[in-house]
């Protein structure tokens, strides 16, 4: 991961790939902290944080995982250094025998604070969370839902409802 100025000048490297305490093993997604002073790298069950001003390592947090989850697909920063993490479970009919949530809010120590968006159907984990130019995050509609959510507050806030009327593809 590399940091460049708005003019395209190379500034510094941010972290490196590896198994060390200041390294990331994989990059599943990235986001900026709400104050944009930190870059957060999501790699499976860990968040590795680096300074956007110097590229220096800040901390690595191992996440407490829900029972069915084996790693997360997307990340967005939340208030007070919390993080929203999204998980799209594998397609398995047995997954619907128990309640399961797709969106979790974590504290800085990796503990679950809140759960949102009970899963209603199978989802595609493509472009789940989009960052806006003002460092807000938008979660695209999930499963059989037709709402886009902002993730900039402590709760997902419904922002846009998509309704194609009679042209909508029917749910199962």
Named regions from a protein language model:
Residues 28-34, 73-80, 126-135, 141, ...:
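Structural signature of eukaryotic scaffold interfaces centered on beta-propeller domains
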Residues 97-157:
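Loop-centered beta-sheet repeat module
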Residues 9-36, 65-66:
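Blade-loop segments of beta-propeller domains
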Residues 5-9, 51-55, 106-109, 151-155:
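Short loop/turn segments that connect beta-strands within beta-propeller blades
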Residues 1-3, 47-49, 101-103, 147-148:
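Hydrophobic beta-strand positions in blades of beta-propellers and related beta-sheet-rich domains
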Residues 25-27, 42-101, 113-121:
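Asp-box/WD-like beta-propeller blade repeats and closely related beta-sheet repeat scaffolds
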Residues 1-2, 37-43, 80-95, 132-149:
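Short beta-strand elements that form the blades of beta-propeller/WD-repeat-like
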Residues 15-22, 62-70, 119-124, 163-168:
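Short coil/turn segments at the loop-to-beta-strand junctions that recur within blades
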């Amino acid at each position: 991961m590399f940091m460049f100025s708005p003019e395209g000048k190379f500034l510094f490297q941010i972290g490196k790939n590896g198994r060390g305490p200041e390294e990331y093993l994989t990059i599943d997604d990235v986001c900026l902290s709400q104050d944009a002073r930190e870059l957060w790298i999501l790699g499976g069950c860990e968040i590795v944080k680096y300074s956007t001003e110097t590229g220096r390592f800040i901390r690595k947090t191992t996440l407490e995982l829900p029972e069915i989850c084996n790693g997360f697909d997307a990340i967005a920063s939340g208030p007070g250094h919390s993080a929203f993490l999204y998980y799209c479970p594998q397609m398995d009919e047995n997954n619907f025998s128990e309640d399961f949530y797709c969106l979790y809010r974590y504290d800085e120590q990796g503990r679950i604070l809140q759960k949102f968006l009970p899963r209603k159907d199978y989802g595609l984990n493509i472009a789940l969370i989009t960052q806006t130019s003002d460092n807000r995050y938008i979660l695209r509609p999930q499963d059989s839902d037709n709402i886009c959510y902002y993730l900039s507050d402590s709760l997902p806030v419904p922002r846009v409802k998509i309704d194609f009327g009679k042209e909508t593809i029917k749910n199962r």
